[in-house]
Amino acid sequence: MMQESATETISNSSMNQNGMSTLSSQLDAGSRDGRSSGDTSSEVSTVELLHLQQQQALQAARQLLLQQQTSGLKSPKSSEKQRPLQVPVSVAMMTPQVITPQQMQQILQQQVLSPQQLQALLQQQQAVMLQQQQLQEFYKKQQEQLHLQLLQQQQQQQQQQQQQQQQQQQQQQQQQQQQQQQQQQQQQQQQHPGKQAKEQQQQQQQQQLAAQQLVFQQQLLQMQQLQQQQHLLSLQRQGLISIPPGQAALPVQSLPQAGLSPAEIQQLWKEVTGVHSMEDNGIKHGGLDLTTNNSSSTTSSTTSKASPPITHHSIVNGQSSVLNARRDSSSHEETGASHTLYGHGVCKWPGCESICEDFGQFLKHLNNEHALDDRSTAQCRVQMQVVQQLEIQLSKERERLQAMMTHLHMRPSEPKPSPKPLNLVSSVTMSKNMLETSPQSLPQTPTTPTAPVTPITQGPSVITPASVPNVGAIRRRHSDKYNIPMSSEIAPNYEFYKNADVRPPFTYATLIRQAIMESSDRQLTLNEIYSWFTRTFAYFRRNAATWKNAVRHNLSLHKCFVRVENVKGAVWTVDEVEYQKRRSQKITGSPTLVKNIPTSLGYGAALNASLQAALAESSLPLLSNPGLINNASSGLLQAVHEDLNGSLDHIDSNGNSSPGCSPQPHIHSIHVKEEPVIAEDEDCPMSLVTTANHSPELEDDREIEEEPLSEDLE
């Protein structure tokens, strides 16, 4: 019995193994078939039914294992006896439709799979189920997307077809309308052949009348504005009215410039340099001259006010024909030679300059490009403003020419001598007297704006004997004239002379003495004197060869400078007694000397034509006042005085250069004694004479004079 039961169990186990292998193979095949069938269709196949049966069997086996663990059966026999009773119930409850109780009993009785194998098998089955679910969902989504895409494509195709149909319908309608219009036009032409020509002629006549009225009104306004401008200019010249500089002088400038940008206006202003005057006639438009229709400003104003409003008709294609008809109907026919806007084959319209081969082409260009519109009217306004500005400029230039002619034909006036000449006056007093008496005096405030007046007449071009003493008086240095120490002049203006390129108002002898006196031991070598000159005055930092020669000449000429030999070499010192002695010997303005100056032989040769003109035109008596001389005139006068130093040294004793650019000297309060001139000398009045003491020896006084600057600055 035991052997038979063993053989049965072995056979059952082998059968079970074969059954499981067949089941597993069926499962694999089913899974493959399921995947392939899922690709083809979504319907439930037999393989899927096998899968469901296998799942139900596994669930039943799991429940049996749990029951065995909980019940804890003692003998396998009892378990074998109880299994046939329990399995059919559970299997019948779980899958009563698929697996029969006999099949479940066979599967459970064989006991081939262990619990671990059953769990692994369950996990594999679950993973397979998840994959199948994901694949099914993915397939469903793809089918939905494909369905949506198909629907969208169908809708787009339908819309395109509808649009094409609509376009075709519209084209057909347009073609039908064009055909109908052509048929109507043909019928009208057949019925009324002359009606269109009459309508065109009427439109042309209306447009011609409107254009003529516009041109007439514009010309009336222009003539009225020109008359108002001339009236204002005449009143302004007479001094009855004054126009502020910030206010527009002409009412035309306030007109709006419609149709032009600021860039175009600037271009028009640049291209009007060759504009002719418009005083003889107004603007000619289309060959119709309307300037003779107005006789006065009152009639023009009344006609312009009484003119009715004009309706502007649209000019489409008959513009050139209208203007040509108007030109033919006018009494005056223009030619290429007489037209102002045409010359040398070029259109002279401002800003145009189009090339036209003949006059007919020019007329076509004029009618097409420069028709009566906003742009052309704005260009006319700009041209009116240009003409008015040029007229104002012409009037100013004419007044300037008249003043120049008046000045050239006027007899030159001579400077009047002062009523009571003084022997000693200061430079400030001299300036005031000359400003009050001399007609060559300059205005006090030349920078203030004034009305245009006739220029002041200039002085004589020939030096008179009465003006020669003034030259000598001007050349005298104020520091030497009043015996003011040089240190008091240089100290306040030290920085000025050090930085400004201005000639100091002192003689070389005075400067050399000052350099020596400022040294610690009152003696300097020649190189130290040169260093003091360049260190103290910016003027001596150039032209070293000329002024150094003058310094050496003055050192050897004047007796007050003593050369001393010592261990270091030769040094120069100052003999104060000799210096003060020579300083006190000054010329006092001898009448005999003054009378002999015009008759001297060397005087005429020393003054050339340029020197005479410079002395006459630059008003030499004003040189003592630095505020009345500009930089250019001061440089010229300085050169003039440098030329005068060599020939007029006998007039005075000290000084050689114009103090025009030097700062105001610090003049101390000095008691000046006034003495009338001797009666026998009244025939030669003198505005300035210097110092009280008179020295009959001219050569002794010339010893202290410096080297002439005409030789220094060559």
From Swiss-Prot:
Keywords: DNA-binding, Metal-binding, Nucleus, Repressor, Transcription, Transcription regulation, Zinc, Zinc-finger. It comes from the Eukaryota. Residues 325-336 have a biased composition (Basic and acidic residues). Pfam families: Forkhead, FOXP-CC. CDD domains: FH_FOXP2. InterPro entries: FH_FOXP1_P2 (IPR047412), Fork_head_dom (IPR001766), FOXP (IPR050998), FOXP-CC (IPR032354), TF_fork_head_CS_2 (IPR030456), WH-like_DNA-bd_sf (IPR036388), WH_DNA-bd_sf (IPR036390). Signal peptide: none annotated. Residues 421-425 are annotated as: CTBP1-binding. GO terms for molecular function: DNA binding; DNA-binding transcription factor activity; DNA-binding transcription repressor activity, RNA polymerase II-specific; identical protein binding; protein homodimerization activity; RNA polymerase II cis-regulatory region sequence-specific DNA binding; transcription coregulator binding; zinc ion binding. Gene3D superfamilies: 1.20.5.340, Winged helix-like DNA-binding domain superfamily/Winged helix DNA-binding domain. One of its GO terms (biological process) is smooth muscle tissue development. Residues 1-45, 280-338, 437-464, 648-667, 677-714 are annotated as: Disordered. Residues 291-304, 437-458 have a biased composition (Low complexity). Residues 387-408 are annotated as: Leucine-zipper. SMART domains: FH. Its main location: nucleus. Transcriptional repressor that may play a role in the specification and differentiation of lung epithelium. May also play a role in developing neural, gastrointestinal and cardiovascular tissues. Can act with CTBP1 to synergistically repress transcription but CTPBP1 is not essential. Plays a role in synapse formation by regulating SRPX2 levels. Forms homodimers and heterodimers with FOXP1 and FOXP4. Dimerization is required for DNA-binding. Interacts with CTBP1. Interacts with FOXP1. Interacts with TBR1. Interacts with ZMYM2. This is Forkhead box protein P2. The gene is Foxp2.
